[in-house]
Amino acid sequence: MAREFSRTRRIAQQLQQELAQVLQRDIKDPRIGMVTVNDVEVSRDLSYAKVFVTFFEEDSKLVEEKLEALTTASGYVRSLVAGRMKLRVMPELRFVYDASLVEGMRMSNLVTRIIHDDEAKQQKHNGKDKTDTADSEGEE
């Protein structure tokens, strides 16, 4: 059982590398553009592979169009990858948009903005305290 799991994991890793190369070098469809293969999950019987991809665009309409183009080209991509990998059964490819990278960038930007706002408030507060202490010293 553990051996089967490690085999599917190894196949998924190799499939991820081969897919990345094929999508980068061999697919010339302008609708797809720059695509990154983040992860691949292969079913236990190797009949399906879920391919998690990201694009440089964040617009949901463009992402849908690119996913549709990838889905249309999946048979061709599958045949190219099958030529590179020596598997008895080449998994059927299902492309899924991986929003984790975009979500991570959004969260990072939020944290950066909050830190910046907090520092600005702290500086404003420290500047106000210095003025108050200067005023109280002048009254004595």
Swiss-Prot record:
Keywords: Cytoplasm, Ribosome biogenesis
Keyword Ubl conjugation among record annotations: no
Claim: Kinase is one of the keywords in the record: no
Pfam families the record matches: RBFA
Compositional bias per record (Basic and acidic residues), positions renumbered to this chain: 118-133
Subcellular location field: Cytoplasm
Molecular functions per Gene Ontology: ribosomal small subunit binding
Coiled coil: none
A single cellular component GO annotation: cytosol
Subunit structure: Monomer. Binds 30S ribosomal subunits, but not 50S ribosomal subunits or 70S ribosomes.
Function: One of several proteins that assist in the late maturation steps of the functional core of the 30S ribosomal subunit. Associates with free 30S ribosomal subunits (but not with 30S subunits that are part of 70S ribosomes or polysomes). Required for efficient processing of 16S rRNA. May interact with the 5'-terminal helix region of 16S rRNA.
Similarity comment text for this entry: Belongs to the RbfA family.
Name this polypeptide is given: Ribosome-binding factor A
Organism: Shewanella woodyi (strain ATCC 51908 / MS32)
